[in-house]
Design a protein with these regions (language model features):
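Intrinsically disordered, low-complexity, charge-dense segments enriched in Lys/Arg
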Residues: 87-94, 99, 114-115
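Short Lys/Arg-rich basic patches
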Residues: 1-25, 29, 58-91, 107, ...
Length: 139
């Protein structure tokens, strides 16, 4: 039996960004009817972001609300190491954008993902959760 691989991800969130993440986490927990780890919320947010239009992702990264959500205040969540490849793929999607001068930081991508999850419909969130469950089971 192979050991599951996980790692810790750093979120740099302001009080506003932290509140938004917790709102997303609470919503996902309600939808699943489970006590889920914080890493599951971040993973679902990134899966939703990976499926979003690159222009929407770039816009979220460049919005003033995204800048207000960032901070030097660090939070750590554990999730499958598969999340790294999803975050990298999202970064590559938006790198050539007119709205951004270069590849966004991991922190900016995570904040955009949280914003995209906050505006997603319940059905899309549950589809992303189901996909995450399948991806993590394969590892």
């Amino acid at each position: 039996m192979a050991a599951r691989r996980s790692r810790t991800y750093r979120l740099r969130l302001s009080c506003e960004g932290t509140a938004r993440f917790i709102d997303c986490h609470h919503r996902l927990a309600r939808l699943t009817g489970s006590l889920i780890p914080y890493g599951a919320t971040l993973f679902v947010a990134m899966l939703l972001t990976q499926g979003a239009d690159p222009a929407e992702i770039a816009a979220e990264i460049s919005l003033a609300a995204a800048r207000r959500s960032r901070s030097d205040r660090e939070h750590f969540v554990g999730a499958s190491d598969e999340l790294s490849s999803i975050e990298a793929a999202v970064g590559e999607l938006v790198e050539p954008s007119d709205l951004l001068s270069g590849r966004p930081s991991q922190a900016a991508i995570f904040i955009a993902g949280i914003a995209i999850m906050a505006s997603s419909e319940d059905k899309a969130i549950m589809a992303a959760f189901d996909r995450m469950t399948r991806l993590v089971a394969q590892v």
